[in-house]
Amino acid sequence: MTNVGDQGVDAVFGVIYPPQVALVSFGKPAQRVCAVDGAIHVMTTVLATLPADHGCSDDHRGALFFLSINELTRCAAVTG
């Protein structure tokens, strides 16, 4: 994992080197306009990227990972 958001970077696209199989990266949190259930909201979002070795995994696993992160952060925003 790499996090350059604290340095003001919006997004980073990491490069993996064998034997690495993936690298998740997070950019800086920012207020963005989002549509939720047909309504417009201003929400704090973070851009995340996940370069991966497709010989070891596939896009489906990456999508499941991001869905989990999305659910965890939504729950934290509601309860926090």
Curated annotation (Swiss-Prot):
**Could you cite one Gene Ontology molecular function of this protein?**
acyltransferase activity
Where does the source fall among the domains of life?
Bacteria
Which conditions up-regulate this protein?
A: A member of the dormancy regulon. Induced in response to reduced oxygen tension (hypoxia) and low levels of nitric oxide (NO).
For this chain, the family text in UniProt reads:
Belongs to the 2-oxoacid dehydrogenase family.
Q: Mind telling me what this protein is named?
A: Uncharacterized protein MT1774.1
